Amino acid sequence: MSCSSALDCFIKNYLKSYQDTLSEFPRYYPLGEDSICIQGTFNADTDDTVFWQPVKRDNVADFSNVEHALNIQLHQDIHAFYGQYFSAPLPFTASFGDGELLQAWNQDDFENLQQNVIGHLIMKKKLKQPATWFIGVLGEGDEMLTVNNDDGSVWIEIPGEKQRTKLAESLTEFLESLSPMIKPPSKPVEELPHTVDHPGIWQRIKTMWDYLLRKK
């Protein structure tokens, strides 16, 4: 099975789990950010939750601009994982713990994602560490899930350190090991003087990298 098909299967199971258990779509705090994923009406002036579901793009987006900017060839799975859908973060449970998969909520979020991938790759180069790119977080967000760009394997990584625990030989194998997690939506907490410019999982990753940069 390809990474693309494995992601399709996980998302299908994710939606089915919500319908079977709650008879509704998942809920999410969009924080004023519109998305084709939203089911029903959307009011940008409120901070209420919305019902949503992942929406497959008409054309798969890619990271060719990132490759050009950094003169690097990214593992092909990055295009399949991030370029197929618009979606909120996808909570999961697995033998190694609970976490969330990162996805782009809308096109602006996808472009922010590309910039964050660039920042991550630059930081890895600065630290003289092998290139990786993140796909999500574990637990409370102090550990990242990252893909080794050389061979496509999936690992646990702490910001500023090398990948430390291998979880799967490929992103396909990793996705096949996950089970959807049904959980109430978590509203990101704004901590002054910072502002929350990315909902949910984005704020976690941003906080991790802010912490790393303060240490360096």
From Swiss-Prot:
Keywords: Cell inner membrane, Cell membrane, Membrane. SUPFAM superfamilies: SMI1/KNR4-like. Pfam families: Syd (PF07348). It is found in: Cell inner membrane. It is a peripheral membrane protein. InterPro entries: Knr4/Smi1-like_sf (IPR037883), Syd (IPR009948), Syd_sf (IPR038228). The keyword Cell inner membrane applies. Its main location: membrane. GO terms for cellular component: cytoplasmic side of plasma membrane. Interacts with the SecY protein in vivo. May bind preferentially to an uncomplexed state of SecY, thus functioning either as a chelating agent for excess SecY in the cell or as a regulatory factor that negatively controls the translocase function. Belongs to the Syd family. This is Protein Syd. The lineage of its organism: Bacteria, Pseudomonadati, Pseudomonadota, Gammaproteobacteria, Alteromonadales.
